[in-house]
Amino acid sequence: MAYITVGTENSADIELFYTDQGTGQPVVLIHGFPLDGESWGKQQAALLDAGYRVIAYDRRGFGASTKAGSGYDYDTFAADLHALIEDLDLDDAILVGFSMGTGEIARYLSRYGASRIAKVAFLGSLEPFLLITDDNPDGAGPQEFFDGIAASVREDRHAFLTGFFRDFYNLDENLGSRISQEALDASVATARRAGNTAIAAAPLTWPTDFRADLAAITVPALILHGTADNILPIDKTGRKFTELVPEATYVEIEGAPHGLLWTHGAEVNEALLAFLNG
C-alpha cells in the first residue's frame, strides 16, 4: 500500500493513501464527498485502457487516509494535492476532479500554478460559489443551510447518508436501471469509512468562494455536469462556471444525477477521453 506524509498531528503522521497504475501521461483523480479514490472505478479502467498512468488518492479523513482532526479547508486540501504531485514528481499531469474534488483543482492552480499541469477537468463541480451573499444573490444557499447539513451529519451521520445518496444518484429514477442496489450499498459502506470529523467538516467547505481562483485556469479545461444534479444543481454551478471560464470545453449530460461517474459512466468517459485526447 502506498502513502505519502503531508503533515503531523499530536506527533502522529497525517498520511494520504494513493494508487498509481499504468504508464504514460499521468492523470490524477480527486474524489468527491463522501467517497474515496476507488469511486473512480469506471473512469480508471477507461483511462488505463487508453494508455494513461492513473493516480487516485483518498482525501485526508476519507478512505484509507489518516482520519485527521484538522485541515478540512481548501487551502489544506490543495497543499495535500501539491505534496502528492511533488512527491511523485509529476509533470505534464492532468487533474480530474469530481464534486468536492473540483475545489482542489481551482485552489491548487491559484496557489501553485500550472507549471506541472497540462489539462484539468471539473466534473459535477462546486464552482464558482455556492453561498448566497450580497454579491452572489443567486447562490445555492445561505450559510445556515450548510451549517444545517453539518449539524445533521454530527447528529446522525448514518441517517444523513441515506437521504444524501437518494439525491446523489436520483434513486427514484435510477435504482435498478443505472445503479444496482449492490453499487449503492458499496457507496454507503465507503462513506461509513470516513472519519467523524472529516464527514462533518466537509459540508462547511462547500460554500468556499472560488471566484478569485478561476483566473488561474490557464490550461485547457473541461467542465462537465449532469442536468438532473440534485446535489449541486447545474444552474448554480456548471452553467455559471462556464460563463466565467468561457474558453473551457463545456459538456452537459442530459438527465444525469450528481453521481454520474457511476450512473452515466460511459457518457462521462466518452467526453473525458475526447477532451484528453483532443
Region annotations inferred by a language model:
Residues 1-28, 49-52, 90-91, 118, ...:
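Alpha/beta-hydrolase fold catalytic core
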Residues 9-70:
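Conserved HGGG/HGGXW glycine-rich cap/lid loop of the alpha/beta-hydrolase fold
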Residues 76-93:
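Conserved acidic catalytic loop of the alpha/beta-hydrolase fold
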Residues 106-111, 115-155:
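Flexible "cap/lid" loop of the alpha/beta hydrolase fold
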Residues 131-132, 136-140, 151-215:
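Conserved alpha/beta-hydrolase catalytic His-Asp/Glu region
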Residues 217, 223-225, 229:
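Short beta-strand/loop motif that positions the catalytic acidic residue
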Residues 230-236:
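Conserved alpha/beta-hydrolase "acid-adjacent" motif
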Residues 247-278:
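Catalytic active-site module of serine/aspartate enzymes centered on a nucleophile-bearing elbow/loop
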